[in-house]
Amino acid sequence: MNNEELRALNQKRKIYQIAWVTRDLEKSMKAWVDNLKIGPWTVLTFTNQSLKYLKVDDKTVTEPFKFLIGISWIGDMQLELIEPVYGPTIYEAFIQKHGEGLHHIKERIADDAIEGVVQGYRDKGIGVTQTGQFETDFHYYLDTEPKVDFILELGNCPILQLTPDKFSTYPSENA
């Protein structure tokens, strides 16, 4: 692929999210609000009850798991903070290996293209370390870290219309 073709290809791509892992979601959200004026944060809890499925290293997770996420926006860029609570996830494994910090960037891929894109990466020897689905939102974390020193996540990135019982907001309106 020449440079012109590479530029044309990348003009069509969309980096949707940048994400960090943390041991304490509330402490991290507070720090981002207080120091960076980034917020409010939509807070969600993911468990074996709320996800349709979760696979780590191509194996379906059958034991209980829980992780918390906070989502905020700067312009059209989604920022995500993730706190692993228990159970097998790549988030806990990352913290054990690297500590807290930048975890991944996420590229938006159309629903009808995702399987082909994932297969294209598999054909290059880049596997999937974790995949799951919440409502209509699905994600694939690719094993890109050994090749490019960061994790690439692929997902369809739909705008979900969640009922108030499925999320909270930080800081609360009453804070």
Residue spans for each PLM region:
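Vicinal oxygen chelate
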Residues: 2-10, 16-21, 39, 43-80, 84-113, 115-175, ...
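Short helix/turn-capping signatures at newly exposed starts of structured segments
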Residues: 12-17, 34, 80
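Residues within well-ordered alpha-helices
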Residues: 28-29, 68, 117
